[in-house]
Every structure is written in structure tokens, then in C-alpha cells.
């Protein structure tokens, strides 16, 4: 069971982004909860529904930071960012 790194890019705040680790089979709802704790912001998920299983390449739109900010899921095994 591999982990997925979700990177929240925040160009508006000139941040390198916020990274949270989630299990490959975690749900969108669970990932949102982790993000709330890390960033205190809100994820408005336009492509997946709560309860959907996360997979490599899933994209989220982070309305809480800026409309066009993108959250990308990558396998953590690739390393780096």
C-alpha cells in the first residue's frame, strides 16, 4: 500500500505549497480533513466526490486559496516534489 502526496500549489501567496500525505486508498473526505488541519482552508472538489478513492493524477481545485490553484496527487515513491 503506497502513499500519495497531495501538493497544494499557492501562487497567490507565493508559497511553495502545502504537502499532505494520504494513503493510496484514502477517500477525498479524509484528504480534505488532513488539509483542513494543515492549512486551515477549504477544498472545493470539482472532479471527485466525497468518498471517492484517491489515485495518482487526481486533481483538485482549491477555492480556499485561489480559484485556479491546483492540487495534484503524486505517488510519494517517486521522491522529490
Say what each PLM segment does.
Residues 1-81:
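Ubiquitin system architectures
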Amino acid at each position: 500500500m503506497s502513499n500519495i502526496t497531495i501538493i497544494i500549489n499557492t501562487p497567490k501567496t507565493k508559497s511553495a505549497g502545502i504537502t499532505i500525505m494520504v494513503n493510496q486508498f484514502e477517500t477525498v473526505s479524509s484528504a480534505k480533513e488532513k488539509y483542513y488541519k494543515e492549512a486551515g482552508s477549504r477544498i472545493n472538489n470539482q472532479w471527485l466526490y466525497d468518498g471517492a478513492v484517491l489515485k495518482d493524477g487526481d486533481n483538485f481545485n482549491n477555492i480556499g486559496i485561489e480559484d485556479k490553484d491546483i492540487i495534484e496527487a503524486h505517488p510519494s515513491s517517486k521522491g522529490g516534489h
